[in-house]
Amino acid sequence: MRLARLGSFHQSRLSFMRQLLRRLATENWRFETTAFDIDARGVGHAVYTAQGPERSYSLVAFAHDLPPEDRSDRVIATAWDATFALFDGVPDDADIDRLRANVPVQEEGRVSEKELTLSRANRSVRLWDHVVSRLAAGEQPDPSLVDEVGYLMRTTAVYGSGKFGAADREAIADRPECHAPFQVEMLTVYLIRTFVMDLVEHMARMQAPDRAVALTPEMRRRFGIGNSTGLGMAPFLVTHPALINAWIGAREEALSRVRSISHPTPDRVQLFRTCAARARQHAYGWHSEHPIQIEKLANLRNDMDLLNTHLETADLSADHAWNALYLWAEDRLSVEGQEMLVSLLLEPHGHLVDDLSSCMAADETRVWQINGQMTTGALREILRDVYGWALALDWTQDNTQARVWYVSENKLEPRLGERFEEPLEPYEQPLCPGRDAARLFADLNADLTTDEPVGAFLLRHPEHRHMTRRAQIAALLPYAEIRDNTIDAVMMPIDMLRTKLSFFGASEFDPRSDRWVRITMFQHAPFPHELEDAFADDWALPPLNMAAE
């Protein structure tokens, strides 16, 4: 649970995008474009409906003619190339009119309990113009340029769970298709991808009706949906300890199951070898200009070279060969490569690990109540066990408590400031469990008692209620707590972002600073009409022949 390792996670079979597409394929969901009213300027609306066994969901998309000077990925932006809402059911004309008045202005508008998500996206202008012009000329886009960027639009927000009037998660959590985390958000992005590809082909036809061509299926799948994610996502790992425990616990259990296999079967060994080769190709096709990510990518490429060379001679039919391979990686690969290997080990074993998807939701209210009857001695032992790393730090040093998490007034978004450069302490959010654990431990030691009820202690020290709760949760849930200082001078918020995004299923992590990152989602994934094909769950790594296409 150290940030350096969490910030090296990759997508896996348990990622939420993978879960979504498996369900859509297995349950034979049907998709229909029920409206596509877009003019030659690319302005209008479209509706894409997904019909499941019991319910329908509809993406309502609004396309805009955005002046270049107004295009911004920042949270303070007020206009976008496209805006979206995921509607619970099938919207009628009155719903479309209501959404048309509210969705394009995003936070300035208001949606209703009929909506499950609210989103917006901007074009990657260089690639967008290239694709439109090539299709209008009757040609396919340049594959190298497509692979360099990876998407035609990137979302700058996908809001759910009650934001801006949308339905709370509790309203849909009991639906089978919504039980796993972030399923409506992932469905939103999946349908946005389809809309974007339809829109770019539409714009090419408007430019050259008699000459324009559509993207080939293989070229179409090369496009994902981009995303720009900043600090707003980072506190999630601290504020949802039970949920994070469920995610990490499922991943660790999946790895344990694979490592426990006594003798791998030849078909799964061959699939693993293929996945390893694809992962090597993926590493060499992944680019970033951020110094830290450049170093991590160099390590990953070297790791994938080492792994594939090792596999040329490794006996994967031997006793507990997967465990031996894991131990080999611990000694020879960087953390980045080790975590890629974890994802690769899960890949051939869907029959063994996919059921763990059902364990990745959490009722966080179940562990929220403070146990006031616990003794202060027991609480002290929990702090020693879980937060020993924090108790060993010198919290009087400026570097140890250099940062302050706070919420900006204008957008109500989390921000990270410098404690000794800005007057931010009055606005500090409780997002540093390590420091707060050390403060709690110091006050417990000052009382010199071990058998006093925690409730009595908290009557004298109410400022420790939140940390007492966290400690009691962490005592029950082994992966609930990051074991690192979240306000240290050299802490990298992008590690927190990548952790969550890897569970989404994101790829191509490309930090633009230590505080925000661009990613790609659903790249190489089948489109709705392709979900019945054999590769419906074999898309997260690019196909080996892709570079030659």
Name what the model sees in each region.
Residues 308-313, 317, 331, 337, ...:
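Long C-terminal interaction/binding lobes of large macromolecular proteins
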Residues 77-294, 298-301, 306-308, 527-547:
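Intrinsically disordered, low-complexity regulatory regions enriched in serine/threonine/proline
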Residues 24-78, 376-381, 388, 392, ...:
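Amphipathic, interaction-prone secondary-structure segments
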Residues 52-113, 189-229, 233-238, 246, ...:
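Intrinsically disordered, low-complexity regulatory segments enriched in Ser/Thr/Pro
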